């Protein structure tokens, strides 16, 4: 992997779903939406001074949202929602944002 570059897309794991679940409330607050369905589909990572997770979320009704979550290197499992893109489709590629 190239430092700073994005990995190839991989199917979401239980760990990635847990990361997404931990920032769901923050995303709902920022988008003023309530997500009945919030399922991680796939993800990419980027190594920086921690790890950025770019996660494609199925939010129901054929709609998808891309979220970016930063996990620091403190070992305390601190997570921060640092970006999101709404109105995505299942076929939209995860890209840097």
Curated annotation (Swiss-Prot):
Cellular location(s): Cytoplasm
Primary localization class, coarse: cytoplasm
Motif (Secondary area of contact): 46-50
Classification via PROSITE patterns: CYSTATIN
Record keyword Glycoprotein present: no
SUPFAM superfamilies assigned to the protein according to its UniProt record, in alphabetical order: Cystatin/monellin
Sorted UniProt keywords: Acetylation, Cytoplasm, Protease inhibitor, Thiol protease inhibitor
Modification sites for N-acetylmethionine: 1
GO MF assignments: cysteine-type endopeptidase inhibitor activity
Function: This is an intracellular thiol proteinase inhibitor.
Family under the similarity heading: Belongs to the cystatin family.
Entry protein name: Cystatin-A
């Amino acid at each position: 992997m190239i430092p700073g570059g994005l990995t190839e897309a991989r199917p979401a794991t239980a760990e990635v779903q847990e990361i997404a679940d931990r920032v769901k409330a923050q995303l709902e607050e920022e988008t003023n939406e309530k997500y009945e369905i919030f399922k991680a589909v796939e993800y990419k990572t980027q190594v920086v001074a921690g790890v950025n997770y770019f996660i494609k979320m199925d939010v129901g009704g054929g709609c998808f949202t891309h979220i970016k979550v930063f996990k620091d290197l403190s070992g305390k499992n601190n997570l921060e929602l640092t970006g999101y893109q709404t109105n995505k489709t299942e076929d939209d590629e995860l890209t840097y944002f």
